[in-house]
Structures are given as structure tokens and as C-alpha cells.
Amino acid sequence: MFHLKIYLVFFFLVSSLFSQNFINQTILFDGNEREYELYIPSSYSENSLSPLMFNFHGGSDFTYDQIQQSDMRDLADENNFILVYPQAHPDPNDGGSTNWIHKGDTDHDDIYFIDVLISELSAQYQIDLERVYACGYSLGGEFVYELLCRLSNKIAAGVVVARTMGQYQYETCSPQHPTPIMTILGTEDFYEGIEYMGEVIYISADETHQFWTEYNNTNYNPIEIEISDVNTNDGSTVTKRLWENGDACVSVVEYRVNGGGHEWPGYNGNMDINSDNEIWEFVSAFNVDGLISDCNLSLTNEEQNSIISPNPTRSIITINNLSDKSILNIIDLKGNIILESTIETGKSQLNISEYSPGIYILKIGGYSTKIIKK
């Protein structure tokens, strides 16, 4: 009985501390009462806009699991961002597991839940809607890919911990703007590319980064930096790989945890980096228009339009002002060369009416840009 009393006192103390910091909120969505934990930083003011950060738990987990391994409240106070830990809804096709992406035939889609939640929060608080960020662990990270692919008009940047892209995402992803993304992946993570009965379920880390670097039109080769091995007892080291100079000056970053597993570095596994700190440092540099600080693009939008028009298009693209005979390539987001041709000086036209709708990379000599086929 004495031990029970001690446990109860401890439980209520922890619960009280938690409740004093977080606001447990509910919202009715798609006929279900959905929960989320909301943290308003001490530095919040109604007189200025604050960024918004979503932090998504892993599959079968709950908000408090993610808060335990990724408690960003101090960061939120220091940097004046509003923090949200949403709760996934039980998946009836997976024994009631709390999954962000439900299995089997389902019309459940949490992309719309987050879309509604952004609108709900922005109606209550002074939120900078150009600086809405997302990070997540495991299945929560897979959901971050979904947000970047399908809700990119509202998500400025994202970070994925312990998950590569699903094959279905790789095949269908279509962001609407240059998209900064960072991953923190262990080389021994079982999600480093998965096949089942000859079918690819998750692509590899290299394929994941290739997709985003090609989409963002970054430098082909990354800068590699070995992070100091400050904890020699954690069984792992970290290599930072940085692809720079993407469109709108966005970048792609990988923290490759050599010897690391399915973990959140700084909480478990590798202790050479603190994932929370690295996440905020990365995403906070961007808004939906790209790098927030001065970005010296090689071509302005006006200059791009003077060369390639119309863009987007359903059929004909006109290429103007070519001073030299050039090699032209059209490349899809998987890196496949769809067209290779030589074009003459002056004005040329391309007919892309037979192409599938989506985003392509047009390269002419040393110049490259995205074209959108409607």
C-alpha cells in the first residue's frame, strides 16, 4: 500500500507538470474527436507572428512517447515557435495501432487533418503561415514525406528521422515549391530499403536523397563533414552530407549515423548530435519561398520566364534567347532522361503534350529549371 501511494504521488506530480506546460486540445475531424498537445512559448506575443512546428510520433505510439524523446519546449521558448504534437487515430486495419498512414483499403487521410489543424491554429494564434514546419520519427517521418509531397503549399521544410521514402511516395510525390528537407538515418536501420516478395516497399537512403536533390536541382555532389565523435561509447559516428544551391537556395541534408539503428539521436543511440537542435537549426532557415536570408539566384523568375514560356503548359514550350547551339535534356524526378536533343540559337519550340502531367527538369547547357506539364 505504501508503494502504491508513492507511485500515485509520482504519477500525479508528473501529470501536473505536463499539464502545466502543454494544452491538451481536441478537434472534430471526419467524425472523430482528434487530440493534440499544444505548447505556446513563453516568448509568444499577439503583436508578432510565430512559426509553427509539428512533431509526429511513430507508428503505434502516442504523443507522450514523442514528447519523451523529442521535447522541444526549451527550443520553442528560445526561438518563439508554437509547438504541436498531434495524435494519430487508431487504424482498424492494423489492430487499432495509432498510424498516420492507415493500411489496406481506407478513406482515412490525415493530410486533411493537418490541413484543417493549421487553419484552426492560425485562427486562434498569430502564426507565420510562411513558416510551418514538420518533423517526425519512423512512421511519423514517413508522414512528413507525405506532407512535403502533398501539402507543400503549407509546409515550408521538413525533417525525417529513422525512415526512408516509401516506394508509393517515390512514384507519386509532387511538391509545389523548392522543398528543403533533412534526414537523420542510421546505416543499420531496418528501414534502409525494404523489399518483400520481390516488391520494393521502402527505397534506400541514397535513392531518397537522390529524389530530393534532383527535384530541388541542388549540386550533384554533397559536401561531407565528419561530426566530432564526442561520445565514443555510443557505438556510432555521424557524417553530415550537404547538397547546396538548390532552386530558391534550398538545400538537402543527411545526417548519416554510421552504425546507428532505428533511433532518435540525442535521446537514444548516437549521442554526438542532438536531433532536436539540428532539426530547428535546419528548418528555421527557410520559409515557403526558400532560404529566408539573401538568396542570389542565377536567374530571377522574370529572367526564367523570358527564356522558357509558357510554364506551366499543356503542350508547347518556347525557348528564347539562345546565343549558342546547345544540348537540351528533359529529366523526370526519378532521374530518367526523357529527351536529349540539340537545339539551335535563337528561338526553339518543344512539344511535351504526350508527357504525363507533373514536374520535369529542363537542362540547356549549364542552365537548368523546372517545367510543369499540366
Regions found by a protein language model. Give the residues of each.
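The feature captures the conserved acid-bearing segment of alpha/beta-hydrolase catalytic domains
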Residues: A156-S236, L242-A248
